[in-house]
From Swiss-Prot:
<comment type="function">
    <text>Forms the helical nucleocapsid (NC), protecting the genome from nucleases. The encapsidated genomic RNA serves as template for transcription and replication; encapsidation by N is coupled to RNA synthesis. Forms the encapsidation complex with the phosphoprotein protein P. Before encapsidation, the newly synthesized free N protein, so-called N0, is chaperoned by P.</text>
</comment>
<feature type="binding site">
    <location>
        <position position="260"/>
    </location>
    <ligand>
        <name>RNA</name>
    </ligand>
</feature>
<feature type="binding site">
    <location>
        <position position="354"/>
    </location>
    <ligand>
        <name>RNA</name>
    </ligand>
</feature>
<dbReference type="GO" id="GO:0019013">
    <property type="term" value="C:viral nucleocapsid"/>
</dbReference>
<feature type="compositionally biased region" description="Acidic residues">
    <location>
        <begin position="458"/>
        <end position="469"/>
    </location>
</feature>
<dbReference type="GO" id="GO:1990904">
    <property type="term" value="C:ribonucleoprotein complex"/>
</dbReference>
<feature type="region of interest" description="Disordered">
    <location>
        <begin position="452"/>
        <end position="477"/>
    </location>
</feature>
<keyword id="KW-0946">Virion</keyword>
<feature type="binding site">
    <location>
        <position position="180"/>
    </location>
    <ligand>
        <name>RNA</name>
    </ligand>
</feature>
<dbReference type="Pfam" id="PF00973">
    <property type="entry name" value="Paramyxo_ncap"/>
</dbReference>
<keyword id="KW-0694">RNA-binding</keyword>
<dbReference type="InterPro" id="IPR002021">
    <property type="entry name" value="Paramyx_ncap"/>
</dbReference>
<dbReference type="GO" id="GO:0030430">
    <property type="term" value="C:host cell cytoplasm"/>
</dbReference>
<feature type="binding site">
    <location>
        <position position="195"/>
    </location>
    <ligand>
        <name>RNA</name>
    </ligand>
</feature>
<dbReference type="GO" id="GO:0003723">
    <property type="term" value="F:RNA binding"/>
</dbReference>
<feature type="region of interest" description="Ntail">
    <location>
        <begin position="405"/>
        <end position="509"/>
    </location>
</feature>
<keyword id="KW-0167">Capsid protein</keyword>
Amino acid sequence: MSSVLKAYERFTLTQELQDQSEEGTIPPTTLKPVIRVFILTSNNPELRSRLLLFCLRIVLSNGARDSHRFGALLTMFSLPSATMLNHVKLADQSPEADIERVEIDGFEEGSFRLIPNARSGMSRGEINAYAALAEDLPDTLNHATPFVDSEVEGTAWDEIETFLDMCYSVLMQAWIVTCKCMTAPDQPAASIEKRLQKYRQQGRINPRYLLQPEARRIIQNVIRKGMVVRHFLTFELQLARAQSLVSNRYYAMVGDVGKYIENCGMGGFFLTLKYALGTRWPTLALAAFSGELTKLKSLMALYQTLGEQARYLALLESPHLMDFAAANYPLLYSYAMGIGYVLDVNMRNYAFSRSYMNKTYFQLGMETARKQQGAVDMRMAEDLGLTQAERTEMANTLAKLTTANRGADTRGGVNPFSSVTGTTQVPAAATGDTLESYMAADRLRQRYADAGTHDDEMPPLEEEEEDDTSAGPRTGPTLEQVALDIQNAAVGAPIHTDDLNAALGDLDI
């Protein structure tokens, strides 16, 4: 029997890896569009600024084809490079399109008519067509300009610093909308605004060069549709990761925003590793977890085998992303979410409810977390030289704090900023500490939260923890009032979905 079990473990470990092709294998050739990328051999800031504005207008143009938009975006992302011709070669690595480079010498005075290099081979008709596309902006853009400030395009770009300021500001906004272009393209505007505010505070985005929301939405859709563009951006992210601490400003910004893109769509996998395996609590010894533990072991091996590009499976539209779905290990996932719900306040922004969520193991995770919060890691205690009395004192102190504050916070944590004036705290034991009550609260948060609540999305970083709401006035009951009503209604009776919907009926969201 033991030989069969060992064979099963080996089979599970190799099953994830057997479909992997050899490194560098070229996929079968398919029909590919020709994408025209414009190249400047001059570092003149006036020419580069004009080309950036021209390409931005092509991306937003009503009449532009997808190949026009993809080429314009690739040109924009290559403009910070001192040698555009070499930098565009990154796009040649994509099997999705053929890249045609067109060298240009400038623009006709007062227009967007290209002056192509003699070697480019562009006809007069093509030049006129591109100029017409640049002028054909959507009616949804105010003042017929992509920028919030209608006077930006009339600026004199006579210094390289001025050009770089605009270029970095525009490209950073394109990177920001790339973050969730595959996993949550309909993310609320507030989520984007938070990141914009962060980079504005850091001085990486000049407020004068802010794009209109409609312009950012169109750019996001183009990036979502263009695999060749996403391939190019992935190569840029890898370049940014390879930089030393002393890097240029652009790749420092790309590396920073890349942290939002890495492992997108794999939140369930990494949270399961963090809370189910990282805690190393005795509950993992349950026989029901054995098969799924082997599955997680094989997935960790697969992730390492995929190499650097494993971080960007969603951006690359890789089928391997499905292997990491939490539906492949539902019991461990349910158990981990129960632990995370108790331990981590950030989990309030993570929509973990799934059709395969197991109620029993979710409750098991919550109970395990509450009982084990005072447990001591023996190896760490030995490294610190703690005596048995000190270990016991630590465990007892945490147990007292947890018990005393159970009514103040549903996860057993302490909220030092909560106001208790005029508010009666209902003990957790009296509220029916059931999965239904937690799920009801989770569904309520999913409706109410404005960002970071999409499927398979990692909990937001520290700067995005606030649950911002729309600026308009609210007439209905607040979230706290509804939550308190639900909590009070739970005394003596479990919460049902119909009751929750009735409670939410007047909530102004």
